[in-house]
Amino acid sequence: LNTATKEELMTLSGVGESRADSIIAYREENGRFQNTEELMQISGIKEGLYNKIKDNITV
């Protein structure tokens, strides 16, 4: 999550251009992710999506 490009984020199931942009914006505004669960702090990323992608992401 801390080094992924927009294109890399978009390879995750359920993550399109808008969500990838939101992840990058969150990272730029708040600094590095401390854990993967922090992803759910982003608007539009709920527990269901997190559970679908959590095995494919790391900080």
Where are the model-predicted features located?
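Extended, structured, electrostatic nucleic-acid-contact surfaces
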Residues: 1-13, 25, 29-32, 36-41, ...
